[in-house]
Amino acid sequence: YYYRRGCLMAIPKFDEIIEYAGKHANTKINVTTNGALLTEKKAKTMLDAGVNVFDISLDAYHDETYEKIRVKGDLKKYRQNVLNLIDVIKKGKYNAKLVVSYVEQPFNSNETDLFEKFWNEAGADFVVVRKLHSAAGAKSNVKNKMELALKDVVRKPCLYPWERLVLTPEGDLGFCPAGWTGESHFIKFKDTTIKKAWQSNFMNDLRKAHLDNNYDCFGFCEQCPDWAHTKWPDEHGANYSDMMSEIVPSDLQ
């Protein structure tokens, strides 16, 4: 899981990175973007390079709602970019799936059904509605509301330490995709491998802390309420791994 703060496609030489990954990674490639830079030319370049999944965050049905959530964003343009992508995938008969996602929040909660209906009918393979999270506690207003709602709820382990690692453009490996300010970074990728980092004492200690509900050594996790929005396989509602295993099952067996 490679990420940057902002749109992934804005990374310099992004096309070259994707082409290299397609040739050498021997795994499935998922590109997450807001659709702003997703021209037909770029879409075809990525599809030809072997991108398997596009996960596009749009967050609104109405243009005026989008402008409130994504200031200076142009939903009309970005929506058309996604519709063009659907057309390119179909006409080129590419083996690629499209996920359109939506973070439900006060500005858009009255148009969730419209959003789901539109994109299901438009040809998206999955339409995902996510809960608004606190960016691992960084968004204090969201964090405070979540903590109030969770005050009588028994805490469960967060799924993320068992689900993924994140790799930043700066070469840091972290354990939390919700954390945007770097507190989950624990090692430089140049000093390890994904396998070694995943099986490291640090990650095993982190998992044990979540299982024991004892965060003495992991204050970043202790203060974060976003565990409540992660879904384990036996819970109601699909999690990210469930969706990806359906989209690209051969990669997860």
Regions found by a protein language model. Give the residues of each.
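Short Fe-S-cluster ligation motifs
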Residues: 1-4, 204-213, 248-253
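Radical SAM/AdoMet-radical enzyme domain recognition
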Residues: 1-3, 7-120, 125-130
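Short catalytic/ligand-binding loop motif for oxyanion handling, primarily in non-cytosolic enzymes
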Residues: 9-11, 39, 62-65, 107-112, ...
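C-terminal accessory region of radical SAM enzymes
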Residues: 87-97, 121-156, 172-232
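Short, small/polar residue-rich loop motifs at catalytic or cofactor-binding pockets
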Residues: 159-161
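Short, acidic, Ser/Thr-enriched surface-loop or helix-capping motifs
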Residues: 167-170
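Short cysteine/histidine-rich metal-coordination sites, predominantly Zn2+-binding motifs
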Residues: 236-248
